[in-house]
Amino acid sequence: MLDLKRIRTDFDTVAAKLKNRGVSEDTLTHLKELDEKRRTLLVQSEELKAGRNIASAAIAQAKRQKEDATQQIADMQKVSADIKTIDNQLVAIDQQVADIITVLPNTPHDSVPVGADEEDNVEIRRWGTPRDFDFEVKAHWDLGEDLDILDWERGAKVTGARFLFYKNLGARLERALYNFMLDEHIKEGYQEIITPYMVNHDSMFGTGQYPKFKEDTFELADTNFVLIPTAEVPLTNYYRGEILDGKELPIYFTAMSPSFRSEAGSAGRDTRGLIRLHQFHKVEMVKFAKPEESYQELEKMTANAENILQKLGLPYRVISLCTGDMGFSAAKTYDLEVWIPAQNTYREISSCSNTEDFQARRAQIRYRDEADGKVKLLHTLNGSGLAVGRTVAAILENYQNEDGSVTIPEVLRPYMGGETVISPK
């Protein structure tokens, strides 16, 4: 959530930054007008309350002296009614301000490219060279069925579209991947966490999914619970409402969890395969950092995600998302896109973001600065390290062989009992 004081004092800068994120200046102007009206009413209310206190003392004095205070009482009752009217107006204005400010996206960092959509994203670097196949490549969904490791038909029967069963070496490959990812992140100083897979509405507000993106989630009817769309939500909210010791920062968390997405608005997109599911595993990285260190931590986090792809030998590229393509809470985002041979393109497999103090303000996560003793908002960062199902897809396609088998990447073999290849039965 943005700082209302910042909007008030640096209106033109904030308006210009949010314009690049598709926010109309009229929206901010209306917010500013509401804020000014609110501040005027607060002054009036305080003045009336001060006058009422004086009148109350005068009435008490008159009664002690057995004087007639009828008119003074009537005047004070009118003042009290005026105060109540103003307070009711303030409640209404506060709600209008909240309705606007809670759905305003974060302001982009100055280094973020300006653009409308993914066409304006900027490629930063590439790693690895896509393999030149001398046979016709298969899509991962066909490989999965032929190898008897992915079962889409029964997933649809048991649950519905965009669900599947992993089986045999497919299940072992999925498990090997997330254990490998967690082990690599732990080496980099991340604390492993097992989170709840349901959170409450306050947690969804804290990380920015609520109220704007409720349609993308799975809520449990008649409860305060929501299935997590990413482990970012419980990990970030771990410290919600707390003041941390600045000496302990930065703090790194990692967790593997299922992620549940309704994929509202994705009808017709990636209807086959592991790219877009309602339920999938993801290894998440979350950081809590001091403001002056957060962009260095973003680079480190992105490197941590890249490390996984490099050790798996999967070609990828790093993209800096433009202002029009970033997520709601992000101030800057790098996407990692892995090469998918059957589609002859790169597809997102990780997204690493610095939200600066946007989530921390919503969730009230602060730290006490050891330098001056002041309590300040910290910065939160989050990143995929990696989306496990998409990594399975990338391995199946990039490591496929002409005979229909798939070679298991060397770093995963210790996690799979020494297996070296997945072969057709």
Curated annotation (Swiss-Prot):
Database matches in PANTHER family: SERINE--TRNA LIGASE (PTHR43697:SF1), SERYL-TRNA SYNTHETASE (PTHR43697)
Q: What is this protein called?
A: Serine--tRNA ligase
**What is known about its subunit structure?**
Homodimer. The tRNA molecule binds across the dimer.
Q: What is known of its domains?
A: Consists of two distinct domains, a catalytic core and a N-terminal extension that is involved in tRNA binding.
Q: Does the keyword rRNA-binding apply?
A: no
Q: Which GO terms describe its molecular function?
A: ATP binding; catalytic activity, acting on a protein; serine-tRNA ligase activity; transferase activity
Q: Its Enzyme Commission number?
A: 6.1.1.11
Give the chief site where it resides. Answer: cytoplasm
- Gene3D superfamilies for this protein: Bira Bifunctional Protein, Domain 2 (3.30.930.10), Serine-tRNA synthetase, tRNA binding domain (1.10.287.40)
Q: Any idea what job this protein has?
A: Catalyzes the attachment of serine to tRNA(Ser). Is also able to aminoacylate tRNA(Sec) with serine, to form the misacylated tRNA L-seryl-tRNA(Sec), which will be further converted into selenocysteinyl-tRNA(Sec).
A GO cellular component term found in this entry reads: cytoplasm
Which pathway is recorded for this entry? Aminoacyl-tRNA biosynthesis; selenocysteinyl-tRNA(Sec) biosynthesis; L-seryl-tRNA(Sec) from L-serine and tRNA(Sec): step 1/1
**What are the UniProt keywords, alphabetically?**
Aminoacyl-tRNA synthetase, ATP-binding, Cytoplasm, Ligase, Nucleotide-binding, Protein biosynthesis
Upper classification of the source organism reads:
Bacteria, Bacillati, Bacillota, Bacilli, Lactobacillales
Q: Which reaction does it catalyse?
A: tRNA(Ser) + L-serine + ATP = L-seryl-tRNA(Ser) + AMP + diphosphate + H(+); tRNA(Sec) + L-serine + ATP = L-seryl-tRNA(Sec) + AMP + diphosphate + H(+)
Q: Where in the cell is it found?
A: Cytoplasm
User: What domain of life?
Assistant: Bacteria
Give the residues the record marks as binding ATP: R261, S262, E263, E348, I349, S350, S351
Positions binding L-serine in this chain are: T230, A231, E232, E284, S384
UniProt-listed GO biological process terms? selenocysteine biosynthetic process; seryl-tRNA aminoacylation
Q: Entry's InterPro entries?
A: aa-tRNA-synt_IIb (IPR002314), aa-tRNA-synth_II (IPR006195), aa-tRNA-synth_II/BPL/LPL (IPR045864), Ser-tRNA-ligase_type_1 (IPR002317), Ser-tRNA-synth_1_N (IPR015866), SerRS_1_N_sf (IPR042103), SerRS_core (IPR033729), tRNA-bd_arm (IPR010978)
This protein's record includes keyword Transmembrane: no
| Entries under SUPFAM superfamilies matching the protein | Class II aaRS and biotin synthetases, tRNA-binding arm
The text of the family note is: Belongs to the class-II aminoacyl-tRNA synthetase family. Type-1 seryl-tRNA synthetase subfamily.
